């Protein structure tokens, strides 16, 4: 894997040297600081108060030419339980050098584009498919995300090659990354292989993928390495101000030991309505159906409202939602604010 990454890095440097001879189209750099604060009371069998997705992120992205671009997204603070600020935030830093959990760096990648081809090297999101992964983490309401989104250490080191048709309606991608089922990114010798089909066909946008996750051989198998296969079929329908999304994956989450996927099905759906640039509303939910022998079926559903008070800008977002979760046996409410403070460096 290291030789593979070094070879791609050498190729990218050669292509970058060539691209610098081109014009400066798309030459820019932006740095954003994104704080978010939530209040999130839960009402159920075990009532509690949390701070939801309260966090601090930064985003540094830009391009040196029309061919070369980069993205660095960092998660500096995580604050779910009011009295565990140091514990949760510290885990982001302690996780550096490990691949079985997300840590300080979500994205740390470079992209080179030539014609219809794009080459990516660095830390990236596993190409798992499903429109649930379209948004940045700081925009998401984890309480209404699927078990896969919440549990999978999806940011891994590797490389990807993507080809887009001349019409720009279809993109096919192949990716190789370290495996989230290995403790160390390269020392474990475990890797994930993914293929994805992404489309933009006027009113319909598919995002389908299949991934083979390398993991240690099970106690019932004879091979020192096994693979768990994740199939994800994301479907999005655009109907004027309305967007309907339905994602399906062939897993009900991850087991307690984080060594394999739980067999089953997860249906993640949303209906979004955006009547203007300053308001959007969503109905969103999940239905998790484990196979025989797994945990019980459960579901959740909620209503979300986003308001953007700044004229001609969505940098400031005020949000709220109400949700019922059958696993918790109760309701939860959330209200919060998010601000994207962006500096144009060049």
Describe the role of every protein-language-model region.
Residues 39-47, 78-84, 127-131, 167, ...:
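Gram-negative outer-membrane beta-barrel proteins
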Residues 31-41, 72-76, 121-123, 172-178, ...:
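Transmembrane beta-barrel strands of outer-membrane/channel proteins
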Residues 303-309, 330-346:
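Outer-membrane beta-barrel "beta-signal"
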């Amino acid at each position: 894997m290291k030789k593979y990454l070094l070879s791609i890095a050498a190729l990218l440097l050669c292509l970058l040297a060539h691209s610098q001879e081109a014009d400066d189209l798309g030459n820019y750099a932006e740095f954003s600081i994104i704080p978010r604060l939530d209040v999130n009371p839960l009402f159920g069998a075990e009532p509690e108060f949390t701070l939801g997705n309260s966090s601090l992120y930064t985003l540094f992205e830009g391009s040196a030419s029309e061919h070369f671009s980069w993205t660095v997204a960092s998660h500096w603070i995580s604050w779910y339980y009011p009295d565990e600020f140091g514990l949760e935030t510290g885990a982001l830093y302690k996780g550096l050098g490990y691949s079985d959990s997300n840590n300080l760096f979500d994205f740390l990648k470079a992209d080179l584009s030539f014609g219809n081809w794009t080459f990516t090297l660095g830390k990236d999101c596993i190409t798992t498919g499903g429109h649930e992964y379209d948004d940045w983490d700081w925009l998401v309401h984890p309480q209404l995300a699927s078990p896969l989104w919440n549990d999978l250490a999806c940011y891994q080191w590797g490389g990807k090659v993507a080809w887009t048709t001349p019409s720009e309606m279809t993109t096919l991608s192949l990716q190789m990354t370290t495996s989230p089922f290995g403790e160390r990114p390269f020392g474990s010798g475990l890797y994930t292989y993914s293929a994805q089909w992404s489309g933009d066909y006027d009113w319909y946008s598919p995002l389908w993928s299949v991934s083979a996750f390398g993991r240690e051989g099970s106690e019932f198998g004879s091979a020192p390495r096994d693979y768990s296969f994740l199939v994800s079929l994301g479907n999005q329908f655009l109907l004027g101000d309305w967007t309907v999304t339905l994602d399906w994956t062939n897993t009900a989450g991850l087991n307690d030991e984080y060594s394999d996927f739980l067999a089953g099905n997860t249906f993640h759906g949303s209906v979004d309505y955006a009547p203007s640039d300053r308001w959007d509303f969503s109905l969103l939910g999940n239905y998790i159906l484990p196979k025989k022998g797994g945990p019980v079926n459960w579901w959740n559903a909620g209503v979300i409202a986003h308001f953007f008070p700044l004229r001609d800008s969505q940098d400031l977002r005020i949000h709220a939602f109400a949700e019922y979760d059958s696993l918790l046996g109760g309701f939860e409410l959330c209200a919060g604010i998010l601000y994207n403070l962006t500096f144009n460096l060049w």
